[in-house]
Amino acid sequence: MSVQNLILSALRRAPRRLVRRIAGPPIEVDGFAMDSNIQILANSAAKRAAPQTYETLSLAQIGGAGNGFDAIAPNRRRNVNIRDVELPLATATLKARIYEPKRASDTDPGILFFHQGGLVIMHHLTDDYFCSLLADECRAKLITLDYRLCPEHAFPAAIEDGLALWDYVHDNAENLGIDRRRVALAGDSAGGLIASVMCQLLRDKATLEKIAQPAAQLLIYPWVSTDITAGGSMESCADMFPLSKATMEMFNANVFPDGKGIDHAWANPLHNENLQELPPAIIATAGFDPIRDQG
């Protein structure tokens, strides 16, 4: 267990009055008050990151900083086994991790999960604990994909990888032990974008040919619009940590260099006028998040 996890564990057991004193004056935005435990962690992380900005770091360094999430994440669920694999998708051979409940069957539901990171940073293991939780609680086989990132790979490479994973899972459902009729899409932040767009594209494709549709979509603080002009949560949460408006500007600059493709429909599923006949959706937003209003 990491030092950060030990601190979190101690904070959970400490009297609330003591925790609030350590946290300092409460952070309040738009009627939301930040949890004292989270405020302590956020303040600590922000102080460590303060000397550096995204303008002075390389993408590799920024991506490495994202690995700090591992330090505060709980341990992976014990009721879940993992397998690290490489999948020969139509777009590329990509790394993936498969989470399987220990009491798995040959016809379990499936979840395809896509990680956060603005389509620019992080990787398929960033949400390791959460993926194990989903697999455990849903009694499903979950596959998280190390999709291709910008700017090395031009947008919409990540979405094309997601669609290729969908096809691969349906073509190999029996070997994977997944019921192809019960496959959901899920993702956080940019991963929510991938899941949302895939649902819309698969819905549209079904008007031309009979194909399976996602059973559900789980969108966790999804990034579903490239519009980051001031206003609403983009303004009130502009200087939050770890996601700020400056970070969003950095993501846009790397995904859409010189603004090329920034209005692409696949980058803006929020503005799709046709939201009919889509899978049931669960949308979770974060109170202190510039893209909160997009959810």
Ranges and model annotations:
Residues 2-14, 76, 83-294:
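Alpha/beta-hydrolase superfamily serine-hydrolase fold, recognizing
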Residues 1-98:
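A glycine/proline-hinged amphipathic helix-loop "lid/cap" segment
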